Design a protein with these regions (language model features):
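Surface-exposed acidic/polar loop and edge beta-strand patches at domain peripheries
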Residues: 1-113
Length: 113
């Protein structure tokens, strides 16, 4: 991380952090704080307006679940995604929607990333 001591409100990047055991990176300045769950691809977990301390993203009641400690026990399509869904803002690549096959490749509910 590079700090600019002459501009204390400049952007800061903190890596090596985690949310409930899932690795994350935090980007913030005086106006916005963004927490990205790098341990889950690039899920944006928090998008906070700093002056009002308002997180603009939905959160599930169960929050972040660490895939290293949770046993998935459902075979229903889409259940794996929902087991680990914490709210926030997900990247949905290469598929946004129901599980499907494309050119012989099986794509899970809301992608594979």
């Amino acid at each position: 991380m590079v700090r600019n001591e002459t501009n204390p409100t400049g952007c800061r990047v903190r890596d090596g952090t985690s949310v409930r055991g899932v690795p994350s990176v935090t980007l913030e300045n005086a106006h916005v704080k963004v927490v990205v769950l790098t341990g889950k691809g690039a899920d944006v977990f928090e998008f906070r307006h700093q002056p009002s301390d308002t997180d603009l993203l939905f959160k599930t009641p169960w929050g972040v679940i660490d895939p290293k400690t949770h046993v998935h026990d459902s075979f229903e399509p889409g259940a794996t995604f929902m087991d680990f869904y914490h709210g926030g803002w997900q990247e949905l690549l290469p598929n946004a929607g129901r599980p499907c096959a494309y050119k012989g490749a099986e794509l899970g509910f809301h992608g594979e990333i």
